[in-house]
């Protein structure tokens, strides 16, 4: 770990950066459908399977959505993954229609990368607190105040914010990309997640100014309560997503993206794990490691509000009924202005090219923004 030349919290950030309102969160939870009974779920799955074939469509799902949807995606030749894996899969798959089960920025990313494809979502109102907390006009004005800095934004942002950026990153490749930019002597603006940005700042020593957004799920994990839980289970491996507060990250044995945490849960020899991320990931962890025990990290305790209780309300808005509706009606389609999509594709494609190079262990030269 290195010491950053300029830390995020040394800077007086814009007042526009307010937490996602309790009203928005309540509205999201109010739209979450009841879990269907077994007979109804089986009927819906059969109908969706037929519709996917009929429409030349494929289901692309995030680890945080309903386990019924995750299983259906895999059963039909689709994808279950983190946001990087979803973007890569959608761009490479031959299907003419992508049904993206996740939150809106994921559907937008699919459309940005595949403008010729139809991109549908179970519910277009499935937002993300990070996206909501980073409005394009305010973020762009902040960037304009620091024209000498390279703008790096997390994938959890709107197409308009991506279009303002030089690089888009996911938690899977953020450390590597920021390290690369630091090696080029670049100073950065990072948005919107302050916890992930601060973690990267501390790990790389990069000169970063951070937008002060946060994820309502990961922001609720509590360091003091996690330490107490860890003391109760000293043999457990603590898995932490870096969108969590620093006090939680410091207790992690493994810190990384959902895919990295899943890989650790499956590959490590230990039999007990404490998991500090959205509990939707536990379904795939338990499937791939049925002999292991997974314990949810605490979100309650001192100062706890449990707005999410480790479940994203917008991810929970995805339903089998919503998928069927999108496929039968053709509605809930992601539509983007062509010029906006082209501008947003440049930093997003830059990340995918970088990630592909990492996979091949290539050496990168001259990949900075033009």
From Swiss-Prot:
<dbReference type="GO" id="GO:0046872">
    <property type="term" value="F:metal ion binding"/>
</dbReference>
<feature type="binding site">
    <location>
        <begin position="241"/>
        <end position="243"/>
    </location>
    <ligand>
        <name>iminosuccinate</name>
    </ligand>
</feature>
<comment type="similarity">
    <text>Belongs to the quinolinate synthase family. Type 1 subfamily.</text>
</comment>
<dbReference type="InterPro" id="IPR036094">
    <property type="entry name" value="NadA_sf"/>
</dbReference>
<keyword id="KW-0662">Pyridine nucleotide biosynthesis</keyword>
<dbReference type="InterPro" id="IPR023513">
    <property type="entry name" value="Quinolinate_synth_A_type1"/>
</dbReference>
<dbReference type="InterPro" id="IPR003473">
    <property type="entry name" value="NadA"/>
</dbReference>
<dbReference type="GO" id="GO:0034628">
    <property type="term" value="P:'de novo' NAD biosynthetic process from L-aspartate"/>
</dbReference>
<comment type="function">
    <text>Catalyzes the condensation of iminoaspartate with dihydroxyacetone phosphate to form quinolinate.</text>
</comment>
<dbReference type="GO" id="GO:0005829">
    <property type="term" value="C:cytosol"/>
</dbReference>
<feature type="binding site">
    <location>
        <position position="312"/>
    </location>
    <ligand>
        <name>[4Fe-4S] cluster</name>
    </ligand>
</feature>
<keyword id="KW-0963">Cytoplasm</keyword>
<dbReference type="GO" id="GO:0008987">
    <property type="term" value="F:quinolinate synthetase A activity"/>
</dbReference>
<keyword id="KW-0004">4Fe-4S</keyword>
<comment type="pathway">
    <text>Cofactor biosynthesis; NAD(+) biosynthesis; quinolinate from iminoaspartate: step 1/1.</text>
</comment>
<dbReference type="Pfam" id="PF02445">
    <property type="entry name" value="NadA"/>
</dbReference>
<protein>
    <recommendedName>
        <fullName>Quinolinate synthase</fullName>
        <ecNumber>2.5.1.72</ecNumber>
    </recommendedName>
</protein>
<feature type="binding site">
    <location>
        <position position="258"/>
    </location>
    <ligand>
        <name>iminosuccinate</name>
    </ligand>
</feature>
<dbReference type="GO" id="GO:0051539">
    <property type="term" value="F:4 iron, 4 sulfur cluster binding"/>
</dbReference>
<feature type="binding site">
    <location>
        <position position="128"/>
    </location>
    <ligand>
        <name>[4Fe-4S] cluster</name>
    </ligand>
</feature>
<keyword id="KW-0808">Transferase</keyword>
<keyword id="KW-0408">Iron</keyword>
<feature type="binding site">
    <location>
        <position position="171"/>
    </location>
    <ligand>
        <name>iminosuccinate</name>
    </ligand>
</feature>
<feature type="binding site">
    <location>
        <position position="83"/>
    </location>
    <ligand>
        <name>iminosuccinate</name>
    </ligand>
</feature>
<keyword id="KW-0411">Iron-sulfur</keyword>
<feature type="binding site">
    <location>
        <begin position="154"/>
        <end position="156"/>
    </location>
    <ligand>
        <name>iminosuccinate</name>
    </ligand>
</feature>
<keyword id="KW-0479">Metal-binding</keyword>
<feature type="binding site">
    <location>
        <position position="62"/>
    </location>
    <ligand>
        <name>iminosuccinate</name>
    </ligand>
</feature>
<feature type="binding site">
    <location>
        <position position="215"/>
    </location>
    <ligand>
        <name>[4Fe-4S] cluster</name>
    </ligand>
</feature>
């Amino acid at each position: 770990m290195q010491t950053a030349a300029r830390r995020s919290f040394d800077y007086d950030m814009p007042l526009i950066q307010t937490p996602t309102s309790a009203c928005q969160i309540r509205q999201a939870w109010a739209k979450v459908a009841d879990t269907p009974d077994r007979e109804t779920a089986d009927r819906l799955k059969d109908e969706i399977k037929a519709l996917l074939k009929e429409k030349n469509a494929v289901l692309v799902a995030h680890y945080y959505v309903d386990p019924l949807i995750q299983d259906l995606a895999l059963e039909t030749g689709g994808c279950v993954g983190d946001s990087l894996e979803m973007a890569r899969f959608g761009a490479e798959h031959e299907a003419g229609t992508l049904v993206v089960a996740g939150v809106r920025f994921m559907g937008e990313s699919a459309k940005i990368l595949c403008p010729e494809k139809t991109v549908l979502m179970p519910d277009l109102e499935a937002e993300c607190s990070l996206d909501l907390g980073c409005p394009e006009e305010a973020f762009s004005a902040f960037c304009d105040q620091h024209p000498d800095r390279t703008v790096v934004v997390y994938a959890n942002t709107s197409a308009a914010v991506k279009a303002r950026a030089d690089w888009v990153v996911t938690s899977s490749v953020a450390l590597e990309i920021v390290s690369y930019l630091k090696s080029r002597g670049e100073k950065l603006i990072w948005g919107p997640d302050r916890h992930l940005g601060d973690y990267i700042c501390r790990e790389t020593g990069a000169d970063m100014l951070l937008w002060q957004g946060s994820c309502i799920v990961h922001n609720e994990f509590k360091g003091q309560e996690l330490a107490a839980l860890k003391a109760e289970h000293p043999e457990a491996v603590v898995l932490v997503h870096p969108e969590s507060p620093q006090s939680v990250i410091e207790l992690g044995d493994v810190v990384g993206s959902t895919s990295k945490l899943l890989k650790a849960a499956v590959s490590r020899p230990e039999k007990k794990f404490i998991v500090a991320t959205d509990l939707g990931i536990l379904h795939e962890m338990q499937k791939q490691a049925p002999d292991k025990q997974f314990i949810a990290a605490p979100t309650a305790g001192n100062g706890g509000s449990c707005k999410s209780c480790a479940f994203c309300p917008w991810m929970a808005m995805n339903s089998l009924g919503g998928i069927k509706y999108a496929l039968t009606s053709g509605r809930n389609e992601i539509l983007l202005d062509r010029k906006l999509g082209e501008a947003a594709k440049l930093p997003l494609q830059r990340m995918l090219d970088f990630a592909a190079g990492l996979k091949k262990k290539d050496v990168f030269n001259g990949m900075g923004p033009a």
